[in-house]
Amino acid sequence: AVTLTCRRRMDKYELIGTYMPQGDGRLVWVDGPALIAWRTGAVLVINEMTSAPADVWVACNDLLEGDAIVVDRTGEVVPRHPNTRVIFTDNRPLGDGGETDQYLGRNAQDASVLDRCWHIACNFPKTDEQIELIWKKVSHLATGLDTGRARNIVRQVVRFAEEVRENNTRAYDNVSISNRGILRFVSMLFAFAKAPKKPENPVQLALGLTIANGLSAAAATGLQNALTYDHAAILSLVMKA
């Protein structure tokens, strides 16, 4: 796959390509991600699509129809490879330009662009699947810990994250916990569990360092309060001799 993460001041040429200066003073054309995908048949993955202005994607409607890319700066015409596909990812619906405490600077996208897309909502994996996915990522950090104990820490954190996700719109100031957040939280708990001298309140400290301290005061308080439901179980595993 060829990937591009959008930004507020993005323009179409970030997709197509541009001339780049070389050490000898020459300007050399460099293909952008869309042109690479059109040539090679790669999947073009556009992350955080609504961070870009709506007019960028309106200008790309011909690309979304599968038309050839006309590089006006070189005169080249590049037909789309039959295997090329375009995937947009975003944390907000593409037609929603509103902001929350989590996702700022978003732009509602034009109906003509939305009409050229399939729209698929991706949910988190089931509990057991998520536990296994997280364990595969962090198992190497559990060296020196009993495997059963380490897996139980993962299980407790996943269940805590699920509880927050289920209640995030009403109890925790619209905050959710991503899988990246789980990985950081578990990694810190493993480190504390292996430490010969434990810090005071290690579970709350780990949550603050890995997730809560980066949130608004209300959201951080909500997460710390939510942790009290699972705190005893996680703490007993971390502090266990």
Where are these regions (language model features)?
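AAA+ P-loop NTPase catalytic core and its hallmark functional loops
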Residues: 1-155, 159
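Alpha-helical lid/collar subdomain of P-loop NTPases
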Residues: 118, 125-241
